[in-house]
């Protein structure tokens, strides 16, 4: 579901991380685990209820994931912009336009237009659209510019292509 160099994993027991917790909201012990390994789905995110419904074991994710991370390259956001050359840097998404059954999405966005690897102009009131599976498969690289303050700790992501509408 992802390129081979991408792995997505959870580290819920990191010291001093804001999302760390020894137990999930169901009282189940949390543990480090891989959800995607070398681009292949290796585990679902399951709380006690969903695990019971699927006749599987809980993964200790009642209340969500904790310190979710993705493998990354060595480039920061500036390096990824240079690698991209010309395209759109999305800095803000608006709305809830994702179909969880088909993976299709259409969301309002804002950001910056990039020319020659440099930010050229601000862009707002645009729409980005596509399919999550196709987008995940077209990831070129994940950046090393990770902000550790949140629950999901992933750097900038360079995607090969995306549909854009607006001026």
Predicted segments, located by residue:
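Dual-mode signal for accessory low-complexity, basic/Gly-rich regions
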Residues: 1-167
């Amino acid at each position: 579901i992802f390129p081979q160099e991408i792995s997505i994993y959870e580290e819920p027991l990191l010291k001093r991380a804001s999302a760390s917790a020894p137990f999930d909201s169901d009282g189940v012990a949390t543990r480090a685990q891989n959800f995607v390994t070398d681009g292949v789905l290796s585990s679902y995110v399951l709380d006690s209820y969903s695990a019971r419904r699927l006749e599987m074991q809980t993964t200790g994710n009642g209340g969500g994931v904790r310190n979710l991370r993705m493998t990354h390259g060595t480039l920061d956001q500036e390096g990824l912009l240079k690698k991209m050359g010309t395209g759109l840097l999305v800095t803000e998404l608006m709305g809830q336009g994702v179909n969880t059954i088909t993976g299709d999405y259409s969301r309002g966005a804002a950001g910056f237009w990039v020319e020659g690897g440099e930010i050229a102009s601000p862009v707002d009131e645009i729409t980005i659209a596509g399919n999550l599976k196709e987008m995940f498969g077209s990831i070129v690289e994940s950046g090393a510019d990770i902000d550790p303050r949140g629950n999901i700790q992933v750097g900038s992501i360079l995607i090969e292509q995306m549909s854009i509408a607006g001026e």
